[in-house]
Amino acid sequence: AREDALAVLWETSRIRLEREILPEELDLTPMSVTRDPELEETQAAALLGELTASPPEALRYVGAKGAAQFYVDGEFSAEFRTGAYPLAGAEPEEFAVDLLATIGFEAQVMSTEESGGETVVTLRQCWEGTPVFDRTAVLVFRDEELKSIQRNVSYRLTGIPKQEGMEQPMNLVTLLMRFVDYVNRNSRVCNEITGFTAGYLLDSNAQSDPALLIPAWYVTTDQGSYFWNAITGEITPEG
């Protein structure tokens, strides 16, 4: 069936997909994440040192090294005092990965940009080695030290994921046919699929608690990238 899918992909839509790029089926099931205020406070203390202020509903924490904000939907940010986090010869990427590990954020470096004396490192959160596509942290370095975790673009898992039922992901053949239909219906241009990355997406209602982690594919093409929800079959262009 997988071989047939490659032929159908080409015959119906003229989209190329090399056989060696086609991955194994997804071995992931949906997970739920419930906000854990105690974990949040522990993470704030790991970032800020001894906490001097932590309101009952959390949100804003103040400590020896600066201040941080944590939101119900997973957004977080921090501003650090001068001298709190000197690089001390470390590379910004390595420093960022190690720092985020202290708050249980298993990080994968996505990009590094330098502009106007600042180095900006963007990292993606993983859970047990699997990327969570819409959980990223953006760390800003200046003058050889960490200055901030950027607001509005930094999101984390708010608790420890737990398995949620046994619903199995759609197989790749089904998803490929969904993609063909999506491309045709939306008059998208796509000549070739160039890569697949397995991971999770958070359900669109990020304010819900618990939130759901949905098995998904991140699919690159010659004309942009897409997220394929492997439970519902929904196709969403990146960005």
What are these regions (language model features)?
Residues L146-G239:
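Extracytoplasmic/luminal low-complexity segments enriched in Pro/Gly and acidic/polar residues
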Residues A1-S111, T122-G129:
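Preferential activation on post-signal-peptide N-terminal prodomains/segments
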Residues A58-T82, T122-I160, T220-I235:
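Amphipathic N-proximal alpha-helical interface segments
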Residues E113-E118:
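Extended, Lys/Arg-enriched charged tracts that mediate electrostatic binding to polyanionic substrates
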